[in-house]
């Protein structure tokens, strides 16, 4: 049943994502909107709710005739360590307000702020989308996006990679690596969990990865690099309107020497092209990090991501950034944890990061 949120002329409500017809209608509208992302889809909100036990509040604005005028997928994030926040889109690198006109943008922004107050979430964070207006802080310096077109064929793709990185990819060809695509979720999770532990950050719950694969169906898959039958690197990717999003990728201890990550991303470019994709979205990275430098080495030009936050006057907005000096001790300690301990504790912490 659809619950009214506020009495406003534009007709704002919280969508019933349990209704398949409602999901299909919203998904079609997002797909048709020029600024839509996979993180605006009902499938993403549902997967996050199921995989991380964080409640979804998917705002939809409708005109008097019932036509959709805008959406704002919000996730209610609660964490005993990091506090409460309302985030769009939870666990996504994109999201924010998607609307047809400025008036609807303003209505959705006001509704998000009111929803945050009602849910006792002192911080509301919008990751991209239309500018919500006065009262919101804008951050265009923390995160960078890396997107470029895919080449017409495999040889052209290899030549599109700058010389130094291209040499690394070529070296990987001689390391007896094999590539498989499909749904080896167990191997992927094990490799991803090891890689984020090595970076000093907690791993997301296994249930989140399973929920995303289930919700996106054929629009998501796992590509794994093996060496003599053993998985050494793996990535879970989303496919949306001709773009591949390698979203969660990582490798084990053997990956560096085998250049498995180099092999993995080149193989994903080839795989995505075979699926009909024309663009490769390498995701976001924090400015000034090794991850950002790695993507630039592949020939991707960084573009700043614009995020918006709002908190009550005099209250600091929630900030969860492992590069913040106040987390440096925790990051160093996490890197030293045995993998079994990191995998046991990590999901409990990470499901509250959002």
Describe the role of every protein-language-model region.
Residues 6, 10-65, 72-82, 128-257:
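A conserved beta-strand-loop-helix scaffold within acyl/acetyltransferase catalytic domains
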Residues 75-95:
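Conserved acyl-donor/pantetheine-binding loop and adjacent beta-alpha core of acyl/acetyltransferases
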Residues 59-63, 68-71, 81, 92, ...:
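Aromatic (often tryptophan-rich) hydrophobic motifs at membrane interfaces
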Residues 89, 159-168, 321-328:
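Short intrinsically disordered coil segments
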Residues 96-99, 147:
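Acyl-group handling in specialized metabolite and lipid biosynthesis
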Residues 2-9, 58, 76, 130-156, ...:
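Active-site/acyl-donor-binding loops of N-acyltransferases
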